[in-house]
Amino acid sequence: MNLIQQLEAEAIAEFKAKKEIPDFRAGDTVRVGVRVVEGERTRVQAYEGVCIARSNRGLGSNFTVRKISFGEGVERVFPLYSPNIDSITVVRRGVVRRAKLYYLRGRTGKSARIAERKVTKA
């Protein structure tokens, strides 16, 4: 392991000690608590939508969340280890057979629905 990989691994371990990141993947509906600065105040804004992509690249990992806001599709890319992310919660798990769900961009209504994955406890 070279020096950069070692520093990234330490930074990720330090971040995971402070915050818990749930196990989620594309197709899952997630609620992301984002810290928003308004003047001198900071507040947490919830952004809920379907995770359509996840990129695992060490400290540069990110995920894309898509939601429909007032009839318009809105996508937002979140860095996974960003200090501006307050919390990530999985609302429901979805059944998909792709790692990237970019095809949802062209779909609306019932065709854009994702079936729920039943979680069985072993």
From Swiss-Prot:
GO biological process: translation
Coiled coil regions in record: none
Keyword Ribonucleoprotein on entry: yes
Pfam families: Ribosomal_L19
GO CC field: cytosolic large ribosomal subunit
GO molecular function, one term: structural constituent of ribosome
Keywords noted in UniProt: Ribonucleoprotein, Ribosomal protein
Keyword presence, Ribosomal protein: yes
Gene3D superfamilies: 2.30.30.790
InterPro entries linked to this entry: Ribosomal_bL19, Ribosomal_bL19_CS, Ribosomal_bL19_sf, Translation_prot_SH3-like_sf
Classification via PANTHER family: LARGE RIBOSOMAL SUBUNIT PROTEIN BL19M (PTHR15680:SF9), RIBOSOMAL PROTEIN L19 (PTHR15680)
Family named by the database record: Belongs to the bacterial ribosomal protein bL19 family.
Protein role: This protein is located at the 30S-50S ribosomal subunit interface and may play a role in the structure and function of the aminoacyl-tRNA binding site.
Protein name per its UniProtKB record: Large ribosomal subunit protein bL19
Gene that encodes the chain: rplS
